[in-house]
């Protein structure tokens, strides 16, 4: 069982809270252990000051042993705290990963079908993996580095205790580091935003090219396809080089900062010590400076670590922007929607108007269709007239701009659309066949027996083909059914639609690749089911026996009647029939 994401996620911090829910005590323990480790680290500068100012000048062996034991105990304690912190961080990190990734996948699969029109498969994949990258960016190592860097800033207070003048010098160097970090991070976020968008485009194009490789071969367009990919890839490489250049510049700066800081620090320290000696002031002395230098070393190391970590963490910004459409998307399922109950097969489209975009053309304009239980209804018309859009509306993939869709007198907008779909047998024009066995593809997750799968195969005229396969119903087929013929693929999709014996069957060009004998078998099987059938087809033999034929042209319903009635009228349908008979 995996927890679903909350209905709306406002920002990346909410994702972190969701992933670490139940591990708040571990996070607090990580912070406390980091603080204790930092406090133990502050013992070293003070012990150094006592060693130089008291133990060595006075040849105090007992004090020397005491300081040594304190430093050993400090090192052991700091290591123990660090190990415990790492274990707890790993536990939190694994918990976040095991909660977030399934929850985001669950959200993606539950989004409305209209959402997927806006993104290619490759682009969606990069957006999906962006959540995993965010989690990785906020990994335990990053958290520990960030906490250690923040806590190391406590040494700044110790520096002011030893010498406020040198502490101000350290503050000035820190200010320079902050400016460099802000500027470089701004540039990186801008470049990484472009890179993430480019990665999505490249992945989308790559998947399209792989899926369409046979079409590229037929049209001899491999060169143009490679040129299109290479253009995007070269831009990606350029952005990657720019990002690497900025990262390297920041790394060089952070490597040079401690060295330059030490040089400046020693120069100012010599000045301040000479001034103290000339005036007889008891201010800065050698022991105090060595202690200050130890505290400053920890402080400047924390500053550089913080600079590097902040730069990495800000890389979350473009990743979050990529992931937002998924994690902030509205799930299709709505617990407030009503259960449709057992559908009898009555369907009504009442004055439906639909367009895919608000500023786009009307796809359907005032279309009304009435289907009684058990009727066989056909929808025909020229290509692009809006026939397949009717199916998308019936399946709840799209929402009409105006008008209503009824199942058994119930408005689809108020029904649990997933419960409606479970009672439909659907064969879409672009139906997909998954990699797996014939049985898996026919059942498609439905709770049916092997015998019921065989019955569906017989009804679709596919049983004889399956019996000739090496492993029968358990024969593995490739993704997309590339090792099946076009007719076998269509019959497999038809068997999938009929396996649960639905009361409503929607078929979009489902028999275009079948011969007359096989189509007769399928038609006879559908008649025996006594189900409501709504069929889109250009094939005359498929729709000849329809109870009613609806003719759509340019999104408008222009004719309704039986096959013979429409042919006798001499309208659009008659012209479509004449065109096929020529």
What is the role of each PLM region?
Residues 327-378, 411, 455, 524, ...:
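Primarily ABC-family ATPase nucleotide-binding module
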Residues 27-81, 88, 160-165, 263, ...:
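Transmembrane helix-loop-helix hairpins at lipid-water interfaces of multipass membrane proteins
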Residues 395:
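Helix-to-loop junction immediately C-terminal to a conserved catalytic motif
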Residues 44-50, 142-185, 241-290:
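A hydrophobic transmembrane-helix motif
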Residues 198, 202, 214-221, 245, ...:
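Cytosolic ends of transmembrane helices, especially the final helix of ABC transmembrane type-1 domains
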Residues 389, 422-430, 438-441, 456-460, ...:
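ABC-family ATPase nucleotide-binding domain "signature/switch" substructure
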Residues 102, 106-123, 194-242, 315, ...:
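Loop segments that connect adjacent transmembrane helices in multi-pass transporters
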Residues 1-44, 57-67, 85, 89, ...:
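Membrane-integrated ABC transporters
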